[in-house]
């Protein structure tokens, strides 16, 4: 059975890792099992990322996870969703300090930034990291934030005028809306 890529991501990969996370947190799954599943799926997602070709002129989107956030599947899946929406997604991986994220945004001349926030309890650094990113990239840069840990930073997300996306469909809708609006401004 062949599924379209977005359906595969939304109906297989995302629920799979949600369930793996639940099992790990409840102690029913060993860390080694979670890591093994992660290696297999990460490799598959990387292959999918490399297989997609996007025009050089497509708007650039930096995708990463902030410092302290090591779970990268939300970011990888977001990068794939963005590529399929016509963006040149530039994936920089997990655990990046705000200064490095800002450097990537500026160096790559990104049109937008996507941050994946994993499940993280009591992450005292994250709100400050998000504020630093917003100050450095300016008020006009769209920042999309998603992932299981986004509930812990909803107030900060509102303060920095970030777009909180609750799932891949909402993320793709936001990306496509942004592209339409940018295109309308040019004409």
Description of each model-found segment:
Residues 27, 139-143:
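Short, acidic/small-residue loops that bind anionic groups at enzyme active sites
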Residues 21, 79, 154:
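Short glycine-/small-residue-rich flexible loop motifs, especially phosphate/cofactor-binding loops
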Residues 1-53:
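Long amphipathic alpha-helical segments
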Residues 85, 139, 158-161:
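Short, structured coil segments at secondary-structure junctions
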Residues 36-135, 142:
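Conserved mid-sequence domains
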């Amino acid at each position: 059975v062949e599924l379209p890529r977005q359906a595969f991501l939304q109906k297989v990969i995302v629920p799979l890792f949600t369930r793996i996370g639940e099992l790990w947190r409840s102690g029913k799954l060993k860390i080694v099992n979670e890591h093994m599943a992660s290696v297999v799926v990460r490799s598959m997602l990387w292959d999918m990322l490399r297989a997609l070709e996007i025009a050089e002129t497509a708007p650039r989107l930096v995708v990463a996870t902030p410092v302290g956030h090591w779970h990268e599947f939300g970011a990888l899946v977001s990068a794939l969703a963005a590529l399929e929406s016509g963006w040149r997604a530039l994936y920089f991986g997990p655990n990046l300090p705000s200064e490095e994220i800002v450097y990537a945004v500026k160096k790559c001349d990104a049109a937008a930034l996507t941050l994946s926030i994993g499940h993280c309890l009591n992450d005292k650094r994250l709100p400050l990291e998000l504020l630093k990113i917003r100050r450095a990239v300016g008020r006009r840069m769209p920042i999309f934030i998603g992932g299981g840990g986004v509930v812990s930073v909803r107030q900060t997300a509102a303060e920095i005028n970030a777009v909180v996306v609750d799932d891949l469909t909402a993320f793709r809708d936001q990306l496509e809306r942004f592209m339409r609006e940018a295109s309308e401004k040019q004409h």
